[in-house]
Amino acid sequence: MKGQAVSQAELLNPQHYQHIDSTVDSGRGDGKYLDLSSVKSVTAPNGHRRIEAVIYVSMPAANMIQGLSVQYDYQMDRSLRHLINVHDNSLKQGDKTPYISIWRVKQGNSGITGTVNDGGTYYNNGQTRQQRIYAENLKAMILPAEFGDEKYKLPNLMYKKAYGIAYDDEP
C-alpha cells in the first residue's frame, strides 16, 4: 500500500471516507473507514461478483491507522433474497421447512468471502509506521464476513456502493 498513507484528520472528511458505524467505536475518531474512491467491481467467475476497496482502521489512542486493500467475493446464490425465493418455491411444492432454516443457512455460509491483498500501518499524522498486520487483528476487525455479525456490514456497504443494491436484496 505504498503511497496510500492517510492521516486521522483526512479520515474525518466524509466526502472521501465513510465511517462504518460499530458498537465498539468510542466516538473519538476510532473505527473503520471506507475510502469511497477505491470501491470498484472486478472480474469474477460466473455466479459471483467481486469488489475491491481500501479500508482504514483507526486507533487514535495507539497512534495507529491500518490501511487494508481488501477484496470481497459474493456468491449470488447465497444472497438472502435468493434463499428466500428458493424457500418460497419449495413451500409451494409442499415442503414444510420453516423460515428459520434460511437464517441458519446464512449463518453457516454468508456467501461473502473476504481477503486482504495488501496493507500498511501509519501514525495518526499519516507517516508510515513499521508494523506488521497480524491475522488475529484482521479476524477481529473485518474477517470473516459472518451473517448477523458486525463484520457483515462492511462488505454489504461496499456492494451497495458498487452495484446500487444491497447484496442480500439480489434475487
Roles of regions detected by a PLM:
Residues G3-L68, D73-P171:
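N-terminal secretory-pathway/extracellular module detecting exported/lumenal segments
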